[in-house]
Regions:
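Cytosol/matrix-facing amphipathic helices and coiled-coil assembly/linker segments
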Residues: 243-257
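Short intracellular "coupling" helices and adjacent cytoplasmic loop segments at the cytosolic face
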Residues: 231-244
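Alpha-helical transmembrane bundle of multi-pass membrane proteins
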Residues: 1-232, 254-512
C-alpha cells in the first residue's frame, strides 16, 4: 500500500462522481421495467392479460422475455467492452455505452408493438452492460489505494440512485388516467427518461482524463504521469512525490507483464493465479445474483401483489425499497476501506440468506390467505433483505471485481464477472414471473440453496484486498512477478518524502 500521506483531491472526486452518472443510466435502464409492469396502461396497449384473467400465462412469459433480452444485451455489451476498453480506451468505451443506451431507450419509449419494444430492451441492455463494466474499471484506475474502496463504491451508490429514480417515477406516473387518450404516458415517459443520464455523461465526457494505466500501456508516459499528478495532488504532497511513486509502480508492473508475454490470447485462463481470479469473479457475481436481489427489484410489484397488497401501494413499496439502497450504499462507500471487502461480503450474504429463509417460510404459510400479520411480516423481510444487501453487498461487489485483476486483464476480467452476472440474471429473471405464479413460495428455495453454497466459497476462496495497490493485490492470488513496495521501504520513503518536502530546492517532476 502506498503511503497515507495523500488524500483525495476535489478533481479526483469530481471525475469519480461524474463518471458514476453512467451507472445511474445503466441502473435506471435495467430497473425501469420493474415499474413498467406495474402500469395498467402498459398491459392494455400491448394486449397483455392482467393477473387473474385468462391469458396471464402469456403475460408472465412476455414479462420474463423483456428482462431476458435485456440481460442478453447486457452480456453482449460486457463482452464488447472487454475489447474496446483496451483498443480505444476506457473513456471512449464510456462514450460508446452512453450512445447505445440512448438508442435503446428511445426505441423502448417509442415502441408501437412488442417486437420493437424487445429490440429496444436488447439495445438498452447492451449499453447498460458496457457502462456497468467500464465505470468501476475506470474508477479503480484513477483512485488511490487508500480511497479506492470509497471511489469505486460510488458505482453502488449511483446504481441505487438509478433504481430509486425508476421506482419513484413509475409510482408518480401510475396516477395517469388509464382511460384517457394519454394513458400510454404512464409507461412511455419513465422509459423515455432513461436517455437523460447517458446524455449527461456523453456531454461531459470530453472533460474526463484518460486512465493513466491505459495511457502507460499505449506508451504515452508523460501524459500518464501528468494525469496521475492532477488526480492525486494534495496540499501535503504538492511536489507530486506520491504520484511519481505510483507511476513507477505501474510502470514496473507493465514492464513485468511485457517480459512475461502476457498479451497472449486467453491469458485470463493460462496461469493458476489468473484462473483463480476468474473463478472468484465468476462465483462473486453468480452468487450475488442468486441471492435474488434482481428478482425483488424487477418483480417487487408482483411479489407485493401476491402478498395481498393492492392498488398503487406495490409501486410505492417498490420505490421505498429501492430508495433504501441509497442509504446502504452510501454507508459502504464511507466504510468499506476500513472494515474490508471480505468482511462485508460474508456479513451481507449471511443476512440475505436469513431474510430469504423467513420470506420463504412466511410465504409458504400465508400466501393466498387473508392473514394480514403474516403477509405484512413477509413484506418486512423483503425490506430486511435489502438492508443486508445495500449496506454490505451491493457496492462491495463492484469494488472487489474491479480490483482483483491486473491492469492488462482488468477489462476482460470484469467483463467475465459481469457476463456471469447477467447470465445468472437471465436464469433468475426469465424464470421468476412464471415460477412465482406456478410454484409460489417454493421459488425461494431455488435462491436459498445456491446461496448457502456461495457462502462457503466466500469464506474459503476470497482474500481480503483492502489497503493494497492494484499492483500489490496480485500477490494475494499467487502472482510471483509483482511490482510492489516492502513495508520497510514504505517507512523509509515516508521519512525521506517528509524530509524532502521541507527542502526548498526540491525539484518536482516536470508536468506535460
Amino acid at each position: 500500500m502506498l503511503s497515507e500521506l495523500r488524500s483525495i483531491n476535489s478533481y479526483n472526486a469530481w471525475v469519480v462522481v461524474f463518471v458514476a452518472v453512467g451507472t445511474i443510466a445503466s441502473a435506471y435502464g435495467l430497473a425501469i421495467i420493474g415499474s413498467t409492469v406495474g402500469e395498467p396502461g402498459f398491459y392494455r396497449y400491448f394486449g397483455l392479460a392482467p393477473k387473474g384473467t385468462p391469458g396471464y400465462d402469456h403475460t408472465t412469459n412476455m414479462v420474463g422475455a423483456l428482462n431476458g433480452v435485456n440481460s442478453a444485451g447486457a452480456i453482449a455489451g460486457s463482452l464488447l467492452q472487454a475489447w474496446t476498453a483496451d483498443a480505444f480506451s476506457r473513456k471512449r468505451t464510456i462514450q460508446l455505452g452512453s450512445v447505445i443506451l440512448i438508442i435503446g431507450g428511445a426505441l423502448c419509449s417509442g415502441a408501437v408493438h412488442m417486437a420493437m419494444f424487445l429490440v429496444g430492451r436488447f439495445i438498452a441492455g447492451a449499453g447498460s452492460g458496457i457502462l456497468t463494466c467500464i465505470v468501476p474499471i475506470y474508477q479503480a484506475e484513477v483512485s488511490t489505494a487508500e480511497t479506492r474502496g470509497a471511489m469505486v463504491a460510488m458505482t453502488g451508490v449511483m446504481y441505487s440512485m438509478g433504481y430509486s429514480l425508476a421506482g419513484w417515477l413509475g409510482y408518480a406516473c401510475y396516477f395517469t388516467d388509464p382511460n384517457s387518450p394519454r394513458a400510454s404516458f404512464a409507461w412511455r415517459f419513465p422509459l423515455a427518461a432513461q436517455v437523460l443520464f447517458p446524455l449527461i455523461v456523453l456531454a461531459g465526457s470530453p472533460m474526463l482524463p484518460y486512465s493513466p494505466r491505459w495511457l502507460l500501456q499505449q506508451g504515452r508516459r508523460e501524459e500518464a504521469l501528468s494525469v496521475l499528478e492532477r488526480l492525486h495532488e494534495t496540499p501535503e504532497d504538492v511536489q507530486h512525490i506520491k504520484a511519481q511513486q505510483e507511476f513507477d509502480l505501474i510502470d514496473e508492473q507493465f514492464k513485468l507483464d511485457q517480459t512475461l508475454s502476457l498479451g497472449r490470447r486467453f491469458e485470463l485462463f493460462r496461469t493458476a493465479p489468473n484462473r483463480r481470479r476468474a473463478l472468484v469473479a465468476s462465483l462473486l457475481m453468480w452468487g450475488d445474483q442468486f441471492l435474488g436481489v434482481y428478482v425483488m427489484t424487477n418483480y417487487g410489484v408482483i411479489i407485493y401483489s401476491n402478498l395481498g397488497v393492492t392498488g398503487s401501494i406495490p409501486l410505492l413499496l417498490n420505490a421505498c425499497w429501492n430508495s433504501f439502497t441509497m442509504i446502504g450504499n452510501s454507508w459502504t462507500a464511507f466504510s468499506v476501506d476500513r472494515f474490508g471487502r471480505r468482511t462485508y461480503l460474508l456479513t451481507g450474504t449471511v443476512g440475505c440468506i436469513v431474510s430469504l429463509i423467513f420470506l420463504c417460510a412466511l410465504s409458504a404459510q400465508y400466501l393466498g390467505s387473508d392473514h394480514l400479520p403474516g403477509l405484512r411480516a413477509a413484506v418486512f423481510f423483503m425490506f430486511f433483505f435489502i438492508f443486508w444487501w445495500s449496506f454490505f453487498m451491493d457496492a462491495t461487489q463492484y469494488v472487489y471485481v474491479a480490483e482483483i485483476f491486473p491492469n492488462h486483464l482488468r477489462p476482460q476480467g470484469v467483463a467475465l464477472g459481469l457476463t456471469v452476472f447477467y447470465l445468472a440474471s437471465e436464469v433468475t429473471l426469465v424464470g421468476a414471473p412464471v415460477a412465482l405464479d406456478r410454484i409460489g413460495w417454493k421459488f425461494y428455495l431455488v435462491l436459498i440453496i445456491p446461496s448457502a453454497c456461495y457462502l462457503v466459497t466466500l469464506y474459503f476462496l476470497f482474500p481480503e484486498t483492502k489497503g493494497k495497490t492494484l499492483e500489490e493485490i496480485g500477490a494475494l492470488f499467487g502472482d510471483t512477478n509483482v511490482a510492489t513496495v516492502t513495508e520497510g521501504q514504505r517507512m523509509e520513503e515516508g521519512k525521506n518524502n517528509t524530509a524532502e518536502l521541507e527542502k526548498p530546492e526540491f525539484a518536482s517532476p516536470e508536468k506535460e
